Amino acid sequence: MFKKLIRYSNKIFDLFTIIALITDRRIRSQIPTVKIITAVIIMYFTNQGSLHGLSQEIAYKRLKGFLPSVSTIARSADSMDIGSIREVGQSIYKKARAAKMLAPCHGMWVGVVDDHEQATSSYCKCKYCKSRTVTRKDGVKDIQFYHQFVAFILAGPKVSFILDIEPVLPGEGEISSAYRLIERVCRNYPRAFSIVIGDGLYLKETVFKLLKAHRKYAIAVLKEERRQLFEEADRLSLLSEPKVYRKGRTYYRVWDHSISGCWDGYGRGVRVIVSEEATPVRAHSKDGKSFEEKVNRANRMWVTNLPRSEDPGSLKNTVSICHSRWQIENQCFNETVNIWSADHVYRHSKNAITAFLLLLFICVNIVGIFRIRNIKDRSIKTKIYLIRLVRSGFHTARKPLPTIPPIPI
């Protein structure tokens, strides 16, 4: 399975050709950067989890003369050109989009943006670490150092494609970093999406105006009850009848309000969508001897400048698009952390952390497309099982790695 993934990556995406464009700032380097990038990609494809895991495989397979040492990989990551790594991601996206490997989400191309804390430590730090003071149960205060980044993904029904990330620097908030990220993504992927969804922090006039300038629509969660938009939507919901429908096991009561004059910073009218959701579930009783029926209820509100359609199913589709925001939590953060060890710090420096994350997300995108488009064996039902097959295929390969074409090492 490892050889099959390597051949697929090079045949469809020219992966081991375009990574030759990645450079670093080492002076008089004896090992080409393409060898280092190849080693990192092999580490991610085989899900080693750390540079030490890769070093053990190198020693076991007797590849010390063909793959660089982990110390060389770490030093090179400090000076890798982040822009050229992003260009590799753009090339893979263009080939995937042209081959129709990606599909729209509920009929529209939807981008989702959110932040994630990668690592937290009380003693490991660098000058780009953010810090905070936490109080333990015994009252002792500790200083935590951590790295944080904002990610932008393209939501989809089967595959969520991770487009780009931006680190959150010390002294700035998530929105400042997200503003740079959204601006760069709109420039590098101008036709990749038409809607951008964010949580309650993105209900800012600066974000809505930026997306409007790039001819994109915005959707943000409305949570703050003190906002005039919240109060006006709550009042209008009492005066109008909702649209009632069922999707799956969930029952929906949805209101769609057009409100103007309640958001002075934005200066334009917006839509506020209110959704009351009830999902019946069967759960264990408190005594643990029987089951009981319960109803999980949730009230959600979103603000958007997406124009209203006269299609009766448009509101139902818009609510589904709003729910696609969870893909960045489930398929980006949770999956990459639990399966791909995305929270592991391979090298504690700002440039290295960003480089390793971008290369990881490139590999995650390729494996996701490979599983959906190329795997015909019905016994391979989960991504975890596929990754184990790839890793075992590399571990049991008899021939040395350089004989596996077309890796240029």
Q: What are these model-predicted stretches?
A:
Residues 172-229:
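Domain-level cores of phosphate- or acyl-group-handling catalytic modules
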Residues 74-157:
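Active-site-proximal, Lys/Arg-enriched surface segment
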Residues 39, 54, 69, 73, ...:
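Short, conserved catalytic/metal-binding motifs centered on acidic residues
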Residues 1-4, 15-22, 245-266, 337-409:
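A short, flexible helix-boundary coil/loop motif
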Residues 133-192:
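Electropositive, glycine- and tryptophan-enriched low-complexity nucleic-acid-binding patches
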Residues 1-68:
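Gly/serine-rich nucleotide phosphate-binding loop at the start of the catalytic core
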Residues 54, 312-347:
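Short amphipathic alpha-helical "interface-anchor" segments enriched in bulky aromatics
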Residues 217-325:
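An anionic, glycine-rich sequence signature occurring as long contiguous blocks
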